[in-house]
Amino acid sequence: MGFGPCGLLGHSLGGAAAILAASKLKTVRSMATISAPSKAEHVRHLLAGSEDELLSEGRADITISGRTFELEAGFVHDLATHDVLGAVASLERPYMVVHADDDTVVRVSEGEALFAAAQEPKSFARYPDGGHLFGNRSHADRMTADVVSWFNATL
């Protein structure tokens, strides 16, 4: 039993992973990314101060917007092998970029690069505030409504 047509949504590095997956999965009929980098290796700047630990221990903890994540050396090494911009350029389906101007983790220029590389139909939902996590409830509600509208219109 397979899956029917679906929409795919990813946030931050998960957005880059969603783009890479959608470029291979024909059941993905529409997609959106929130605060996604245009290059998977973008995460390297988040390793400042942790690279020695990553090399010597094979793993390191990084903190993004107050949340701690464990990364393994193999994961970081693999990042350089993925072409996110090439994958988004190859998508032949609707794509929505969501990004906040004040995102300090993944700069809005990353979202602009994704949008520029994407084929039509495409949309850029840009918010003056919201940060990387859209932590303010009203910002999150507005962004969620926009993404749901996108999927309703494109699926």
Q: Predicted regions: what is each one?
A:
Residues 2-10:
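Alpha/beta-hydrolase fold nucleophile elbow
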Residues 10-14, 18:
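Gly/Ala-rich beta-loop-alpha elbow adjacent to hydrolase catalytic centers
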Residues 24-74:
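Hydrolase active-site cap/lid region
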Residues 91-92, 97-99, 103:
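Short beta-strand/loop motif that positions the catalytic acidic residue
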Residues 93, 107-116:
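Short alpha-helix in the alpha/beta-hydrolase fold that links the catalytic acid
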Residues 102-106, 133:
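Acidic catalytic loop of the alpha/beta-hydrolase fold
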Residues 118-133:
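Catalytic histidine neighborhood in serine/cysteine hydrolases
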Residues 130-142:
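Catalytic histidine-centered segment of alpha/beta-hydrolase-like enzymes
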